[in-house]
From Swiss-Prot:
Keyword Ribosomal protein included in the entry's annotation: no
Signal peptide positions (record): none
EC class (word): isomerase
GO molecular function annotation: FMN binding; isopentenyl-diphosphate delta-isomerase activity; magnesium ion binding; NADPH binding; oxidoreductase activity
Record's subcellular location: Cytoplasm
Coiled coil: none
Species for this entry: Bacillus cereus (strain AH820)
Name this protein carries in UniProt: Isopentenyl-diphosphate delta-isomerase
Protein family according to the UniProt entry: Belongs to the IPP isomerase type 2 family.
Entry binding sites for substrate: 6-7, 152
Summary of subunit composition and partner proteins: Homooctamer. Dimer of tetramers.
One of the GO BP terms on file: isoprenoid biosynthetic process
One of the record's GO cellular component terms: cytoplasm
Gene name per UniProt: fni
């Protein structure tokens, strides 16, 4: 019951705190192309996460489940939207359903709505191999997300305080999983060192979950009597974290999330090196405040605008968009310089 109440609290406070939009994309500027040699009608947006083919570089990221009828209804609506647009979708952490079978329906609903969709299961880094297998089977998942949320847990009044052995648990899950494993942050970004460690244990993809979207430190602080306000501005911005990711020069796929709301955000994230982008809080707000049809329309506009931007840049495919020239400025440039990451190749390609 406590876990279910927390799920509902997270929805309420995530909507009330909003998104910070401190993602750093304002420091990224495309180099204008006066002769793009492109046509809107021939632009294609297919992409891949590992060997998993996606029809769009936009997917619906993990939000909820395990909070009774309300979370069931949210996942039902999100699954409908995913089916309508042929988008991949992740569910929120399934630990609630593993501990209380009555909550499983709030996750299983997605397969009832969209039997042939691409879905990601989701568990925290405390999960065992057996729990990971059950979570995947619960929703017939095509991949498994393992989320890292140290700052959220520390800020959460009833959260975890012991984070030893996490990498080893992830490695065991990777070795035993029948589906690709994606490791994701929840709004605090990832450093290149963390991503190199994750690559070393064989994960397929990393969702950098950068600072700039829903602030789960702020969400949990709303639930505390004594606020840990020093965590409210903690983390690595989304744009910076994507560049840290690509600087590792490994074969992982990268997912950009954290405050992404516009087609320009999507285009910049992909141009920095992401394979796809994920929306959560922004889509949830539209769904809860304006309804399902408004969300369907918004995703239509996102795809239209992304194709306009790709046409302007002369990028006919997502792969070509990953190679267009851009300039990195401001705080993002200074951070990367201090971290020893060369940015000149972005502007000269």
């Amino acid at each position: 019951m406590v876990r279910a109440k927390r799920k509902l609290d997270h929805i309420e406070y995530a909507l009330s705190t909003g998104q910070s939009r401190t993602h750093g994309f304002h420091d990224i500027e495309f180099v204008h192309q006066s002769l793009p040699n492109s046509s809107y009608e021939t632009i294609t947006c297919e992409t891949k996460i590992g060997e998993l083919s996606l029809s769009s570089p936009i997917f619906i990221n993990a939000m909820t489940g395990g909070g009774g009828e309300k979370t069931l209804h949210i996942n039902e609506q999100l699954a409908y939207v995913a089916k309508h647009h042929n988008l991949a979708m992740a569910v929120g952490s399934q630990m609630a359903a593993l501990k209380d079978e009555s909550e499983a329906a709030s996750y299983k609903i997605i397969r009832k709505v969209n039997p042939n969709g691409i879905f990601f299961a989701n568990l925290g880094s405390e999960a065992t191999v057996e729990q990971a297998e059950r979570a995947v089977d619960m929703v017939g998942a095509n991949a498994l997300q393992i989320h890292l949320n140290v700052i959220q847990e520390l800020t959460m009044p009833e959260g975890d305080r012991d984070f030893t052995g996490v990498l080893q648990r992830i490695e065991k899950i990777v070795l035993n999983s029948k589906v690709p494993v994606i490791v994701k942050e929840v709004g605090f970004g990832m450093s290149k060192e963390t991503m190199q460690q994750l690559a070393s244990v064989g994960v397929t993809a990393i969702d950098i979950g950068g600072q700039g979207g829903t602030n789960f430190a702020a969400v949990e602080n709303e639930r505390r009597q004594r606020m840990l306000s020093y965590f409210n501005n903690w983390g690595i911005q989304t744009a910076t974290s994507i560049i840290e990711a690509t600087s590792t020069n490994n074969n992982l796929s990268f997912i950009a999330s954290g405050g992404i709301q516009t087609a320009l955000d999507v285009a910049k994230a992909i141009a920095l090196g992401a394979n796809t982008t994920a929306f959560a809080g922004y889509f949830l707000r539209i769904l809860m405040e304006d309804g399902i049809e408004k969300l369907v329309d918004e995703i239509d506009l996102l795809h239209t605008d992304l194709k306009f931007i790709m046409t302007a840049l002369g990028a006919k495919t997502i792969e070509e968009l990953q190679s267009v020239p851009l300039v990195i400025k401001g705080e993002t440039y200074h951070w990367l310089t201090q971290r020893g990451i060369d940015t000149t190749h972005y502007s000269r390609r």
